[in-house]
């Protein structure tokens, strides 16, 4: 390390006390030679990220395709993972070829034959060990999520914790894959229903939660007896490589067959192979509404199942009876967390006219305190958008809102200069708008918050529901009647409806998903496991007669 430092600093001699421990050399060097601090920063960042990649077994160029412990080597095209944090290339991943894809599906199909016969609690035990393995790698994996995707380090670590939590949930679930018993109208008969493993589950995940959404699907599917093929986002492929490397440790110890956990990489074409493949009974896809419609149509054409978790256009209603200070935290985090790139990010605030001015002033002042910068620095609240295409969409949305008559309360814009070299850092914007604006009806994956007023709760709920999407919603109120109306049949039409918390940050114990153009799918907790299984009704006759249902007579 010292030799590398000297080379990096053009042979500068290092004068260090022998008592200084090697791991402190960098820190001591920076302290002794403060003028060189700026020079050393890129070296230090490179060194730390190199260490993280080594821990996660990520090479400079990585194979695209794996069936568990084994990887398929090829010379296919490369996907370059570019960090939005600083614009650096982290590493590269090969793309999966059609021949490799077919080998993966064959391997998964063969593995399913034995995996489904393993008792569910034993599959749960393997998932428990995966949770423990994730605990060991929480720090480096969380840092990779933050660096490759751009979310804050706290959110990156939180995403890995979500993986651990779903493992814990799935372990308990493995002993509770319950059916039902029913009473038969025929004497001497017993009826019940049970659930069987479905088969191969194809998982297409998005960049904004590059590891958590995979785990929501995979851990449940595994305890249900399914095998999985995962295509991570081409914008965050290294997170997929890292997860496959982590779980391979557990699979090796437990002699899990190749094909239970498969990884493929590539762009739209690879996703289309999954969607059109009749060997894959279920496709779980997370992404834009446009993508979901294409996948839903492809899977539906072959009468397969699709679990779609698509866009959101989430609103918080701020009642005149709200605790405004508490509401402020939920609104600001919901709008700017992950730089507005959560499907549950808060896009709209529907504020009662009596508190509109007061709350808006609080909001504008809060936005002045937001720190934007390198997400690996825990002092910063907001990191970058994923890439320059996202930045362009953000800028276009602001201009569209202005063109429709929106009033900008907090100016947006792209940040430039030191620390913002990637060109992906933007300022969270706040705009007064109308719910009917075309741009407000559209989900923009960026930190743009639209404000609007209401007079009555009926009006507020109507505005909340009057968008094509139906994922998450919330009301801030201390009035029980208002909260109950919001949660009633005449209230929010979203899959998630909260009271006195924001729209983002769902816990894994509840089913996650939404209605309308959000896709209708449910993942994670509650009884979401049922989508990964096939339901079977059984009737058993334990008499010496064969009576027919509905009293039909058929004598021979």
PLM segments and residue spans:
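Conserved C-terminal structural/oligomerization subdomain of aldehyde/semialdehyde dehydrogenase
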Residues: 86-91, 255-256, 280, 317, ...
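ALDH superfamily catalytic-core signature
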Residues: 246-249, 290-435, 457, 462, ...
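Hydrophobic face of amphipathic alpha-helices that form TPR/SEL1-like repeat modules
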Residues: 48-86
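Glycine-rich loop-to-alpha-helix module at the N-terminal edge of alpha/beta enzyme cores
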Residues: 90-177, 188
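Rossmann-like NAD(P) dinucleotide-binding subdomain of oxidoreductase/dehydrogenase enzymes
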Residues: 179-326, 454
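Short, well-ordered beta-strand elements within core beta-sheets of diverse protein domains
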Residues: 89-96, 111-117, 203, 316-319, ...
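Residue-level signal for inorganic ion chemistry
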Residues: 87, 123, 145, 167, ...
């Amino acid at each position: 390390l010292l030799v590398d430092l000297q080379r990096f600093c053009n042979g500068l001699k290092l004068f260090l006390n022998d008592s200084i421990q090697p791991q402190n050399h960098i820190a001591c060097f920076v302290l002794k030679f403060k003028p060189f601090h700026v020079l050393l920063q890129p070296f230090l960042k490179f060194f730390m990220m190199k260490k993280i990649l080594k821990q996660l077994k990520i090479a400079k160029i990585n194979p695209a395709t794996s069936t568990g412990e084994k990887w398929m080597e090829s010379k296919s095209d490369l996907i370059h993972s570019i960090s939005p944090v600083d614009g650096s290339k982290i590493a590269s991943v090969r793309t999966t070829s059609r021949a490799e894809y077919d080998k993966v599906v064959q391997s998964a199909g063969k593995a399913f034959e034995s995996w489904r016969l393993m008792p569910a609690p034993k599959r749960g035990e393997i998932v428990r060990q995966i949770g423990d393995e994730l605990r060991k790698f929480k720090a480096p994996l969380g840092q990779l999520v933050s660096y490759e995707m751009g979310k804050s380090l706290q959110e990156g670590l939180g995403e890995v914790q979500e993986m651990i939590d779903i493992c814990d949930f799935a372990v308990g679930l493995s002993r509770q894959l319950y059916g039902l018993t029913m009473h038969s109208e025929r004497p001497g008969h017993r009826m019940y229903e049970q659930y069987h493993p479905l088969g191969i589950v194809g998982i297409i995940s998005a960049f904004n939660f590059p590891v958590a959404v995979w785990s929501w699907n995979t851990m449940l599917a595994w305890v249900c007896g399914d095998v999985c093929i995962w295509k991570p986002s081409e914008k965050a492929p290294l997170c997929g490589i890292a997860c496959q490397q982590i779980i391979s440790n557990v699979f090796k110890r437990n002699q899990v067959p190749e094909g239970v956990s498969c990884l493929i990489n590539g762009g739209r074409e690879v996703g289309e192979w999954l969607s059109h493949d009749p060997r894959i009974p279920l496709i779980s896809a997370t992404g834009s509404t446009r993508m979901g419609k294409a996948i839903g149509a492809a899977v539906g054409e072959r009468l397969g199942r699709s679990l779609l978790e698509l866009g959101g256009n989430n609103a918080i209603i701020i009642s005149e009876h709200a605790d405004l200070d508490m509401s402020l935290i939920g609104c600001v985090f919901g709008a700017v967390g992950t730089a507005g790139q959560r499907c549950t990010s808060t896009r709209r605030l529907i504020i009662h006219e009596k508190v509109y001015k007061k709350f808006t002033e609080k909001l504008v002042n809060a936005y002045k305190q937001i720190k934007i910068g390198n997400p690996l620095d825990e002092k910063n609240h907001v990191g970058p958008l994923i890439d320059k295409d996202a930045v362009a969409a953000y800028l276009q949305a602001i201009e569209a809102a202005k063109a429709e008559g929106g009033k900008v309360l907090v100016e947006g814009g792209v940040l430039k200069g030191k620390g913002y070299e990637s060109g992906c850092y933007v300022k969270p914007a706040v705009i007064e708008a109308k719910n009917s604006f075309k741009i407000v009806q559209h989900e923009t994956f960026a930190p743009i918050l639209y404000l609007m007023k209401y007079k009555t709760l009926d009006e507020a709920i109507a505005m909340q529901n009057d968008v094509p999407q139906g994922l998450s919603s919330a009301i801030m109120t201390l009035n029980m009647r208002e909260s109950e109306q919001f949660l009633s049949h005449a209230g929010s039409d979203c899959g998630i409806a909260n009271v006195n918390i924001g729209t983002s940050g769902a816990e894994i114990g509840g089913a996650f998903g939404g209605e309308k153009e959000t896709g209708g799918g449910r993942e994670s907790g509650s009884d979401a496991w049922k989508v990964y299984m096939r339901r079977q009704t059984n009737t058993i006759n334990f008499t010496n007669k064969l009576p027919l249902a509905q009293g039909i007579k058929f004598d021979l």
